[in-house]
UniProtKB/Swiss-Prot annotation:
Amino-acid positions noted as binding [4Fe-4S] cluster in the UniProt annotation, renumbered to this chain: 349, 409, 412
Protein name as annotated: 3-isopropylmalate dehydratase large subunit
InterPro entries per the UniProt record, alphabetical: 3-IsopropMal_deHydase_lsu, Acnase/IPM_dHydase_lsu_aba_1/3, Acoase/IPM_deHydtase_lsu_aba, Aconitase_4Fe-4S_BS, Aconitase_4Fe-4S_dom, IPM_dehydratase_rel_enz, IPMI_cat
PANTHER family linked to this entry: 3-ISOPROPYLMALATE DEHYDRATASE (PTHR43822:SF9), HOMOACONITASE, MITOCHONDRIAL-RELATED (PTHR43822)
Length: 468
């Protein structure tokens, strides 16, 4: 048998049918659903008289549109479109008998945090969702990626998906990370190295000592942004950390089923002589705390750098940089550490887990945010929120002057009440800094939770190492 990558192994195990041209019908183990990309899909089932093929493998959570303030069940601070979408998900989940975590359930949260938290995400699975950041689940050694609404309907009806196989790409982060450098700095640095199109046509496997050293939550952060690097999905081979995380979760296998699953999970790694179509190697100690400066995730630099000049670039990038600087209101040559901010957002499916909140609280403990600055922490799930309150993290945030919110996607995207106003500048732990992503005219700088906390204290982009 020829050597295989982790991606090869998972793919081959899920092929239901393959045509001569490589078009493949792939079996799907888990289908995650939220309120924005699912209403038309469920309506399509009704129109054709179909049911959900595997309701026991379909999990629904409202997250994109839901407000994160107390009293949100009343829905009086949602737009009409948002109310309709959340109500539709509630109706569809009940009618079609799928697993559902409504807003009133403490287990509700961002779908990519709820899935792993509840044990729905397991090694070797195929996982899809009508959301681009489904790649998050690749941290478990699961083949996970986003799909469109028509594909959502197809998976609901058949539990399969028509696909063509991607190429294999290895991203190796060698050695150890330096103090103050986090999983978010890794994933942003990789995108800065490859560009947002560097992974197009590939599934990325992240490996190396620095990746192995990460916790499961850190690995989820890395895989979450594989899509920003252009990749179809991101993967990390499962190991003892993975198995320990999964054990005992509500929907993880138990007893003999656990042992049987483990016997397969332990084979989920890339063989030594497996073929890679592309390999990128980055030294862990070359990675510094980073921030984005422009309107693409590839516009990333160490916090110690300065705003770049358009003439430092070539080709079409020159004009793109000029437009980015104009939109962001930045002047070339300005040290990034002198860029003042108006807002801090800590949360999202990239950095809304308990370890992210711990990292931010560690920087904020005993300190206050800068006067006049708006700052909020939005836990990724109700369970994360409860744990943070139990650990005293919520008190640290509130004493520092932060708003302590309920779970949801929040200010990651302008689809709910948490938005930037035109011209406002935000230090954000989310995953996209596109024009208008956080609100029309809003300016977004991506960074780690610790870096965002540091920025809240000083009121400007700040090297967290100066506060450690």
């Amino acid at each position: 048998m020829s050597p295989k990558t982790l991606y090869d192994k998972i793919w081959d195990a899920h092929v239901a049918h393959e045509a001569d041209d490589g078009t493949t019908l792939l079996y799907i183990d888990r289908h995650l659903v939220h309120e924005v990309t699912s209403p038309q899909a469920f309506e399509g089932l009704r129109m054709t008289g179909r049911t959900v093929r595997a309701p026991d493998k379909t999990i629904a959570v409202p997250d994109h549109n839901v407000p994160t303030t107390l009293g949100r069940e009343k829905a009086d601070n949602m737009t009409e479109d948002s109310r309709i979408q959340v109500a539709a998900l509630d109706t569809n989940a009940k009618e079609f008998g799928i697993h559902y975590y409504p807003v009133s359930d403490i287990r509700q949260g961002i779908v990519h945090i709820v899935g792993p938290e509840q044990g729905w995400t397991l090694p070797g699975m195929t996982v899809v969702c009508g959301d681009s950041h489904t790649a998050t689940h690749g941290a478990f050694g699961a083949l996970a990626h986003g799909i469109g609404t028509s594909e959502v309907e197809h998976v609901l009806a058949t539990q399969t998906l028509i696909q063509k196989k991607s190429k294999n790409m290895k991203v190796e982060i060698t050695g150890k990370l330096r103090p103050g450098v986090t999983a978010k700095d890794i994933t942003l640095s990789v995108i800065g190295h490859t560009g947002t199109a560097g992974g197009t046509g590939y599934v990325i496997e992240y490996c190396g000592e620095a990746i192995r050293d990460l916790s499961m939550e850190g690995r989820m952060t890395v895989c979450n942004m594989a899509i920003e690097g252009g990749a179809r999905a991101g993967l990390i081979a499962p190991d003892e950390k993975t198995f320990e995380y999964c054990m005992g979760r509500p929907h993880a296998p138990k007893g003999a089923q656990w042992e049987a699953a483990m016997s397969w999970w332990k084979t989920l790694y890339s063989d030594d002589d497996a073929h890679w179509d592309k390999v990128i190697t980055i030294k862990g100690d070359d990675i510094a705390p980073v921030v984005t400066w422009g309107t693409s995730p590839e516009d990333v630099l160490p916090i110690t750098a300065s705003v770049p000049k358009p003439e430092d670039f070539t080709g079409g990038k020159v004009g793109a940089v000029q437009r980015s600087l104009e939109y962001m209101g930045l002047t070339s040559g300005t040290p990034l550490s002198e860029v003042e901010i108006d807002t801090v957002f800590i949360g999202s499916c990239t950095n809304g887990r308990i370890e992210d909140l711990r990292a931010a609280a560690e920087i904020l403990k005993g300190k206050k945010k800068k006067d006049g600055l708006r700052a909020m922490v939005v836990p990724g799930s109700g369970l994360v929120r409860a744990q943070a309150e139990e650990e005293g993290l919520a008190d640290i945030f509130k004493e520092a002057g932060f708003e302590w919110r309920l779970a949801g996607c929040s200010m990651c995207l302008a689809m709910n009440p948490d938005q930037l106003q035109p011209g406002e500048r935000c230090a954000a732990t989310s995953n996209r800094n596109f024009e208008g992503r956080q609100g029309r005219g809003g300016r977004t700088h991506l960074m780690s939770p610790a870096m965002a906390a540091a920025a809240a204290i000083t009121g400007r982009l700040t090297d967290v190492r100066d506060l450690m």
